[in-house]
Design a protein with these regions (language model features):
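N-terminal active-site wall of soluble small-molecule enzyme domains
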Residues: 1-35, 39-46
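Short beta-strand/loop segments at the ligand-binding rim of alpha/beta enzyme cores
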Residues: 10-16, 58-60, 132-139
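Short hydrophobic/aromatic-rich motifs at helix boundaries and adjacent loops
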Residues: 17-22, 54, 95-98
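A generic, well-ordered mixed alpha/beta core segment in the N-terminal half of proteins
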Residues: 33-71
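Active-site loop/helix belt of alpha/beta enzymes
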Residues: 46, 50-51, 67-187
Length: 188
């Protein structure tokens, strides 16, 4: 919905849809409005292939890998196999590979063990892709917390969430930034 509104407002830059789109109508809207859906498996990739091939134009997508968040994404161990399969699809273009950090806002200096493990798993997939000569497109791992505290996790893109809305991802992060909340949540 938000991606369509951005297009209707005249935004021409690439727009990545971070949610899990599995219904053909959702993916058809992505194709029509030139939005990049997030894929978490071959089912969605094949739907994109069929829709895009029928329209005569390619569809750019990002593949999300689950490295520990356990919310959305293909198991990271399947990353290289999925990229190989997606690369073989004529009407689907892999524009990026990403994952989401589960605990990047943990207190303490440096990376917490889970974030370090997630980075290692993500790196293992990227290394495998490079060695096999497969495309990764834009690589992205950093959420707001990792953007603020871990430059080594920035790769090609960062995905700020809470910080975009003027909120620090944790009380101990971003204290030197002049973030101004863009929203409030109230309840009675």
């Amino acid at each position: 919905q938000e991606g369509v509104e951005l297009r209707q407002a005249g935004l021409a830059q690439p727009v990545l849809v971070l949610g899990n789109l599995t219904h053909p109508d959702e993916l058809r809207a992505c194709l029509h409005w030139q939005l990049m859906p997030t894929l978490s498996g071959m089912r969605e990739a094949l739907l994109c292939q069929n829709l895009a091939a029928g329209s005569g134009r390619a569809m750019a997508v990002h593949l999300k890998l689950d490295t520990g968040m356990s919310r959305l994404g293909a198991p990271w161990q399947e990353g290289q196999r999925l990229v190989e399969a997606i690369a073989a699809l004529e009407a689907v273009q892999l524009a990026g590979v990403y994952s989401h950090l589960a605990d990047a806002d943990a207190p303490g200096a440096g990376l917490d063990p889970l974030t370090r493990q997630q980075q290692q798993q993500f790196e293992a997939v990227l290394t495998g892709l490079q060695q096999a000569g497969l495309p990764s497109g834009a690589r992205h791992l950093a959420n707001s917390a990792a953007t603020l505290r871990s430059p080594g996790l920035h790769y090609d893109l960062v995905r700020v969430g809470l910080a975009l809305y003027g909120h620090r991802p944790a009380a101990h992060l971003g204290g030197g930034l002049a973030l101004q909340p863009a929203m409030q949540v109230r309840a009675r």
